[in-house]
């Protein structure tokens, strides 16, 4: 009898494990080369880490050039991918992790009629915004591993926060 109960428990556990493997994955960040968006050549971000390493390469193996401190503002020249941003540090091209960045607010307009999802794209209600609607960009969506998902812009529209497809925005 004990053997039968153990087998039932193992079978149930295996089934639950497979269910977890086949459940819907979190949204994956689109590679930057797949996104057509008019972004400013550089934009300001705030560091949200005690100390953030500044590296020579866009990976954890790059040599550390120094650090930037929490609440310090940095100009991002470009995003290498969802996880790394290129900046200038002491006159040199350098890289920081996007996992510890918060975008400063900036203005944008919708380029066409577009959906505004609140509270999230996955679980939100869509409201249609007409072309030329002004919004404040507060940040980006997040990738599965915590970097930026540039497919989505996190915006404020009339005091309500939600998400709009980045491709439908013209940044100023």
UniProtKB/Swiss-Prot annotation:
Residues 1-29 form the signal peptide. This is Uncharacterized protein YfhK. PROSITE patterns: SH3B. Residues 42-105, 112-172 form the SH3b domain. Keywords: Signal. Gene3D superfamilies: SH3 Domains. InterPro entries: Cell_Wall_Dynamics_Protein, SH3-like_bac-type. The keyword Signal applies. Pfam families: SH3_3.
